[in-house]
Amino acid sequence: MALLEFFRPKKTTTASVAKERLQIIVAERRSAGQSTPSYLPQLKLDLLEVIRKYVNINPDQVSVNLDQKDEDLSVLELNVTLPEDK
């Protein structure tokens, strides 16, 4: 039975095809030299809006950075300077 399975073509699932396509897109973006994703400015504004619901802060008190540690690891860093309670 194993011999017959050897000659059959492997069936690809839609998940494996989607994963492969996503890996190609990510590799193309990395090779194109796109240092920061286009969504970071909007992400910063959204985070600022959420933080302002609880604390009164200025936009310059929030920084969002995306660091590429190695080929398959990225770190999203969020720094918020909160005012002191009085």
Swiss-Prot record:
Gene: minE
Gene3D superfamilies: Cell division topological specificity factor MinE
Keyword annotations from UniProtKB, A to Z: Cell cycle, Cell division
Protein name as catalogued: Cell division topological specificity factor
This protein's record includes keyword Cell division: yes
Family recorded in the similarity comment: Belongs to the MinE family.
Highest taxon listed in the record's lineage: Bacteria
Role of this protein: Prevents the cell division inhibition by proteins MinC and MinD at internal division sites while permitting inhibition at polar sites. This ensures cell division at the proper site by restricting the formation of a division septum at the midpoint of the long axis of the cell.
GO biological process, one term: cell division
InterPro entries cross-referenced by the UniProt entry: MinE (IPR005527), MinE_sf (IPR036707)
